[in-house]
């Protein structure tokens, strides 16, 4: 902080400091010649909306009230730091805001003041950076009244410097630890609770951190000022003695209690006089542990600690010595035991203690020779004063010894190159009764204020002169006259008059005070002084303060009686001699230095030290006197604003220009605002920084009267101009963010489209492996005992499960889910089907329903129209655990029943996806599903009444099963042992462009055509020509949907026929009707005589028509002559192969091979007649009539469709006579697949 003393010309290389090279070169006001090294602008992602103004120089109106309003606004939003140029203003929040964490600390490392919000870490960073960069000693002056947060600010500066100063050496780290340990140690001995502050510093401290040439701390030195030793012997109500007395008496270990007789603070006069023993929120025992730990870190040995606590114990017990008047009116000590214990602690003779406290030795002198010696008894008042003087002297010297011991441990371990000083001294004090202590404190604050004004004004004037800027001087209050009023000897000031009074009337304090009042009359002509009866007023910069004269001369003498010096000199304790090293010189007649002399000398030494360093300033403000968070007393703060001179500081800083910055830094901040200095966020200016700054101001239309160009800096006149520049910069980022968002959204769309393509390709490659596994499991569920439909065995068939989307959100599936009350059950399977419904007075009839299988229930859902509204409801809910078995036939029909055995009838249902339903139900029951497969279906039509539905196979019947009169008529299916065909491979097509986006060119973000699209297509294979006996089935023309594809890709892949309204290709003709299928025939090999009425007698050599085949060794045959049907052993027959049909356009489908082996074996020898079948249908003498056409019914795929090639799987011819029909269907399917591939359907999912 402060005003940099950086050289204008030349270049000074820094050595390994924390900032990046770009920041250092740009931000230091130094140019390396030619084009400046400008760091690329970045958006401040952590930048918050500014509350008020962060720099008071940017206020539009400069007044104390405006400053107060801005500080209040920021305080209410937890913004406690505000700048005045390089000066930091801090308002005490009286609570933890979480702004001193390691993360916050790291955010300020290596950052310029303008890059981050105001903070005490920014002050520390600036001081450390300037020290390393320019080898200048730095100092941070913290000022403000008691309780404003000065000590906290000093600790945070030490925290920051210890963190960023580097150094991995163990000695460097030990030095850091010791420096940080000085805080709790000196606070316990030097701080106390006052009415205005619970941790008020009752001494001044100047900590000087010493660094080597690498910026690593190698040592430190502490100078203490103005310890308030009078607090040791007396405090006002609700205040406390120094913290250490309460820490020691409350938490002393048993060793010290035994050695020194330590008791609770209520037992001692010096700690109980004010009746205040505790501080809200402070744990004295924990603080004492921190104090002991700090002593250990400093290196204080255990014997040294014992001696320190021995002296503290002696002070406490000295305060308990009481005096009474004897018969002669002199002071006497009634309780000798306390005197004896004090003598034990000081290691002196008790008689000497008694004598030193009650008798004063007077000596007369004549003509320069020693005269007579008299022992003058003291009265009780005088004895109490002597007692308190001894206690204060011991504590004062003990505090000095602790500081010296700390300095001894912090002695520099290496060569000291530079230093950073931190001044923490209690601020300006105004009480109801102000005495000598307040005069000294306020005097030192006047000296610090004088430094602040002189250096601030001087630095401002020097900068304007150096930069050749025209400005108007600002009037301000120079407090040098107040300092002279207090410290001057000619004419005599307050201190000189006080010393003269002490020397003239030294024997009687009352007479000395009266003499002092008389001397003050000579100062009445000074405009900053007023003399009143018994008091005088000094007009300080912080306000008028009235000081009481009474007792001021005694405090100024500040000398220990020779009797007490002789007492401590007689001690056998070496530590006591260390505290009082000066021997009593009986012959020295010179006046010893007074307290005012000492404070004057200390203040001048401090000023001389600060003047040799580059200063930084922190002005602390106390928002209220109640130490309450979030309370802002405008009157109190306004008073502090006035006496701290913040308004004058703002005026001096403004001086006509609210903002100034080096050319390099200005260009780095605002180069985005000019098209000649930036392009797409990059710095493009090739000239020097000064011309770049001029160009930016020109392109942003800033009037000439609003700025001036100096030698190395640009000066902006009003804060509104700076706000306009910052607003334009923010708008640039806003526009850039919109462009980035647009590009990012386009990129995301590109990624999503690519992901969809990859997923689609993966699904095509894998073909839904999990679904295939479930499909293959379905073959095992049927146990190879039930004929299969040909469409069920397609390689593309998948067991998708939830066909109706019951588990989906939205759409019809959600309507069904809500209407059926499925709730949170997991849906395993859903499709449409039929349930056999019995109606009174009518025959049973299939009725459409919806089947839903969940992990717990099987639900039959009905859809009804009620008052013109579709109502969906669960007609029946069956727990899956209640399903005892499933009954189905061994033919290819889709009917089955659930045997439940409940009070309700078992449902008889028709579902085209029966096998898939059985599979999911078996998995839900963990494989415990019992499936009964026979030539009929059993179910309980009524509770306890078992009904049977026969299933018969009729040749030539349609692919749609029909139900009539408890009989299901179906056609022949694939053999029960059939399995699914392999998954068909898709036809390779040309690759499409990667994206259809408008911002991205085809081929992806990099542009260019897709590489896949450039691959040559495989040569198109000729279609096999049909035989002459069959009309060819023309291939339908595929009309692909248009896609955005590059011209090159289209040309490289394939050519397309242009389609238009006038040039549309004619539709393909309908397929030729297939010839009537031939009936399967069998030749009789052996004679067979029927044994039952349902068997057919045959003779060798006859031809019989095969009606149906059973897997149990019996065939149902019909005599073509008599048209009689019956059961015939399969081994007695040889099936005659039908003549092959003409070759279809597509590859003919292979038919199942006949059992030629069995036939050949039968031809060799006639086997024994097989055993009669276990159960045969009663068909003796009955002619099998073809079933009537069935009414259309609903199904999962298309329950209303009778198309034999539909998804129901019911249009598959099974006999050899239907081979031509199979060929036609195969050709139609092949053409449909080619059309689908030609359209490049991206949404085809199995």
Curated annotation (Swiss-Prot):
ATP binds at residues 144-151. Residues 1229-1240 have a biased composition (Basic and acidic residues). The modification Phosphoserine is found at residue 372. Residues 51-730 form the Myosin motor domain. Residues 1-41, 956-1080, 1127-1246 are annotated as: Disordered. GO terms for molecular function: actin filament binding; Arp2/3 complex binding; ATP binding; hydrolase activity; microfilament motor activity. Residues 1033-1045, 1065-1078 have a biased composition (Pro residues). InterPro entries: Fungal_myosin-I_SH3 (IPR035535), Kinesin_motor_dom_sf (IPR036961), Myo1_CA (IPR054489), Myosin_head_motor_dom-like (IPR001609), Myosin_TH1 (IPR010926), MYSc_Myo1 (IPR036072), P-loop_NTPase (IPR027417), SH3-like_dom_sf (IPR036028). One of its GO terms (cellular component) is mating projection tip. GO terms for biological process: actin cortical patch assembly; actin cortical patch localization; actin filament organization; endocytosis; mitotic cytokinesis. The keyword Nucleotide-binding applies. Pfam families: Myo1_CA, Myosin_head, Myosin_TH1, SH3_1. Residues 734-754, 755-780 form the IQ domain. Residues 788-976 form the TH1 domain. Coiled coil: none annotated. Residues 1077-1138 form the SH3 domain. Phosphorylation of the TEDS site (Ser-372) is required for the polarization of the actin cytoskeleton. Phosphorylation probably activates the myosin-I ATPase activity. Residues 1151-1166, 1214-1228 have a biased composition (Low complexity). Residues 419-501 are annotated as: Actin-binding. It comes from the Eukaryota. Keywords: Actin-binding, ATP-binding, Cytoplasm, Cytoskeleton, Hydrolase, Motor protein, Myosin, Nucleotide-binding, Phosphoprotein, Repeat, SH3 domain. Type-I myosin implicated in the organization of the actin cytoskeleton. Required for proper actin cytoskeleton polarization. At the cell cortex, assembles in patch-like structures together with proteins from the actin-polymerizing machinery and promotes actin assembly. Functions as actin nucleation-promoting factor (NPF) for the Arp2/3 complex. Plays an important role in polarized growth, spore germination, hyphal morphogenesis, and septal wall formation. Belongs to the TRAFAC class myosin-kinesin ATPase superfamily. Myosin family. The myosin motor domain displays actin-stimulated ATPase activity and generates a mechanochemical force. This is Myosin-1. It comes from Aspergillus terreus (strain NIH 2624 / FGSC A1156).
């Amino acid at each position: 902080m402060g005003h940099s003393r950086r050289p204008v010309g030349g270049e000074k290389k820094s050595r390994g400091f924390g900032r990046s090279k770009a920041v250092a070169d740009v931000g230091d006001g130094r140019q390396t010649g030619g084009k400046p090294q400008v760091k690329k602008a970045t958006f401040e992602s952590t930048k918050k909306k500014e509350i008020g103004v962060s720099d008071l120089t940017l206020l539009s109106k400069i007044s104390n009230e405006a400053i107060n309003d801005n500080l209040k606004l920021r305080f209410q939003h937890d913004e406690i730091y505000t700048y005045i140029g390089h000066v930091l203003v801090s308002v005490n929040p009286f609570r933890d805001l979480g702004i001193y964490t390691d993360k916050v600390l790291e955010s300020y490392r290596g950052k310029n003041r303008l890059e981050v919000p105001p903070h005490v870490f920014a002050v520390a960073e600036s001081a450390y950076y300037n020290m390393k960069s320019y080898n200048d000693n730095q100092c941070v002056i913290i000022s403000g009244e008691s309780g404003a947060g000065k000590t906290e600010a000093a600790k945070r500066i030490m925290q920051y410097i210890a963190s960023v100063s580097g150094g991995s050496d163990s000695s460097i780290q030990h030095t850091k630890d010791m420096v940080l340990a000085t805080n709790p140690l000196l606070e316990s001995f030097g701080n106390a609770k006052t009415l205005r502050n619970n941790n008020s510093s009752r001494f001044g401290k100047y900590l000087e951190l010493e660094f080597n040439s690498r910026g690593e701390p190698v040592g430190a030195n502490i100078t203490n000022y103005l310890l308030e030793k009078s607090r040791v012997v007396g405090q006002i109500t609700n205040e406390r003695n120094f913290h250490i007395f309460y820490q020691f008496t409350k938490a002393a270990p048993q060793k010290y209690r035994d050695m020194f007789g330590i008791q609770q603070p209520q037992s001692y006069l010096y700690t109980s006089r004010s009746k205040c023993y505790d501080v809200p929120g402070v744990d004295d025992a924990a603080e004492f542990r921190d104090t002991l730990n700090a002593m250990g870190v400093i290196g204080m040995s255990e014997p040294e600690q014992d001696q320190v606590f021995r002296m503290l114990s002696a002070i406490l017990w000295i305060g308990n010595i009481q005096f009474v008047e004897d018969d002669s009116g002199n002071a006497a000590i009634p309780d000798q035991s306390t005197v004896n214990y004090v003598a034990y602690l000081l290691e002196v003779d008790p008689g000497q203690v008694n004598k030193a406290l009650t008798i004063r030795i007077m000596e007369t002198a004549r003509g320069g020779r020693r005269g007579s010696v008299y022992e003058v008894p003291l009265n009780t008042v005088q004895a109490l004063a002597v007692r308190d003087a001894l206690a204060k002297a011991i504590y004062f010297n003990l505090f000095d010894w602790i500081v010296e011991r700390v300095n001894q441990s912090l002695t520099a371990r290496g060569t000291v190159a530079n230093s950073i000083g931190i001044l923490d001294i209690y601020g300006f004090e105004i009480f109801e009764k102000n005495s000598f202590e307040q005069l000294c404190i306020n005097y030192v604050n006047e000296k610090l204020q004088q430094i602040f004004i002189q250096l601030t004004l001087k630095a401002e004037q020097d900068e304007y002169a150096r930069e050749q800027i025209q400005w108007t001087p600002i009037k301000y209050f120079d407090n040098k006259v107040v300092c002279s009023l207090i410290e001057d000897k000619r004419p005599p000031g307050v201190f000189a008059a006080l010393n003269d009074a002490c020397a003239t009337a030294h024997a009687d304090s009352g007479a000395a005070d009266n003499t002092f009042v008389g001397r003050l009359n000579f100062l009445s002509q000074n405009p900053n002084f007023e003399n009143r009866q018994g008091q005088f007023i000094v007009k300080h910069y912080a306000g008028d303060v009235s000081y009481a004269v009474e007792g001021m001369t005694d405090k100024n003498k500040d000398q220990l009686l020779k009797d007490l010096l002789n007492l401590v000199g007689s001690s056998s304790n070496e530590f006591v001699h260390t505290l009082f090293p000066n021997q009593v010189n009986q012959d020295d007649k010179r006046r010893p230095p007074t307290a005012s002399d000492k404070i004057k000398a200390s203040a001048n030494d401090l000023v001389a030290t600060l003047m040799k360093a580059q200063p930084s300033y922190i002005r602390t403000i106390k928002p209220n006197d109640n130490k309450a968070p979030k309370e802002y007393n405008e009157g109190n703060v306004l008073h502090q604003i006035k006496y701290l001179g913040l308004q004058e500081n703002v005026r001096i800083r403004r001086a006509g220009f609210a903002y100034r910055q080096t050319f390099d830094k200005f260009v780095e901040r605002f180069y985005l605002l000019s098209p000649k200095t930036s392009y797409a966020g990059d710095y493009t200016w090739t000239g020097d920084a000064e011309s770049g700054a001029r160009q930016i101001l020109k392109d942003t239309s800033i009037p000439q009267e609003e700025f001036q160009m100096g030698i190395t800096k640009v000066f902006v006149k009003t804060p509104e101009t700076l706000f306009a520049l910052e607003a334009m910069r923010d708008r640039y980022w806003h526009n850039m963010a919109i462009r980035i968002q647009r590009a990012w959204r386009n990129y995301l769309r590109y990624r999503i489209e690519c992901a969809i393509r990859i997923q689609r390709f993966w699904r095509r490659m894998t073909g839904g492996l999990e679904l295939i596994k479930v499909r293959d499991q379905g073959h095992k569920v049927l146990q190879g005992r039930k004929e299969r439909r040909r469409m069920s065995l397609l390689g593309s068939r998948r067991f998708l499960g939830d066909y109706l989307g019951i588990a989906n959100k939205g759409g019809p599936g959600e309507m069904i889910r809500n209407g059926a009350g499925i709730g949170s059950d997991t849906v395993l399977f859903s499709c449409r089907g039929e349930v056999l419904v019995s109606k009174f007075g009518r025959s049973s009839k299939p009725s459409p329903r919806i089947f839903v299988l969940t992990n717990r229930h099987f639900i039959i859902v009905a859809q009804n129209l009620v008052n013109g509204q579709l109502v969906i409801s669960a007609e029946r809910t069956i727990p899956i655990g209640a399903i005892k078995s499933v009954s189905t036939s061994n033919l290819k029909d889709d009917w089955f029943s659930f045997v439940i055995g409940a009070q309700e009838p078992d449902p008889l249902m028709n579902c085209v996806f029966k096998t898939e339903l059985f599979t999911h139900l078996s998995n839900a029951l963990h494989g415990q599903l019992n499936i009964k497969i026979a030539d009929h279906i059993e179910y309980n039509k009524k509770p306890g009444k078992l009904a049977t539905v026969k299933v018969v196979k009729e040749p030539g019947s349609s692919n749609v099963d029909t139900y009539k009169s408890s009989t299901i008529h179906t056609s022949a299916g694939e053999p029960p042992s059939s399995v699914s065909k392999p998954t068909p491979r898709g036809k390779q097509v040309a690759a499409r462009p990667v994206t259809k986006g408008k911002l991205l060119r085809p081929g992806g973000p990099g542009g260019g055509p897709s590489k896949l699209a450039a691959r040559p297509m495989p040569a198109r294979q000729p279609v096999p020509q049909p035989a002459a006996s069959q009309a060819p089935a023309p291939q339908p023309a595929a009309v692909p949907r248009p896609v955005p594809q590059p011209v090159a890709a289209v040309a490289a892949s394939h050519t397309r026929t242009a389609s238009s309204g006038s040039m549309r290709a004619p539709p393909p003709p309908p397929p030729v009707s297939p010839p009537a299928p031939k009936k399967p025939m069998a030749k009789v090999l052996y004679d067979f005589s029927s044994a039952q009425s349902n068997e057919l007698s045959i003779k060798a050599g006859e031809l019989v028509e095969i009606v149906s085949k059973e897997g149990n060794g019996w065939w149902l045959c019909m005599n073509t002559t008599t048209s009689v049907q019956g059961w015939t052993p399969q081994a007695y027959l040889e099936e005659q192969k039908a003549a092959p049909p003409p070759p279809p356009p597509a590859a003919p489908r292979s038919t199942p091979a006949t059992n030629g082996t069995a036939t050949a074996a039968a031809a060799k020898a006639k086997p024994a007649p097989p055993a009669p079948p276990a159960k045969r249908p009663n068909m003796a003498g009955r002619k099998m009539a073809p079933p009537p056409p069935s009414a259309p019914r609903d199904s999962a795929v298309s329950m209303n469709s009778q198309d034999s090639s539909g998804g129901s799987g019911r249009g598959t011819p099974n006999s050899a006579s239907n081979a031509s029909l199979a060929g036609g269907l195969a050709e139609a399917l092949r053409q449909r697949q080619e059309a689908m591939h030609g359209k490049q359907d991206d949404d085809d999912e199995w």
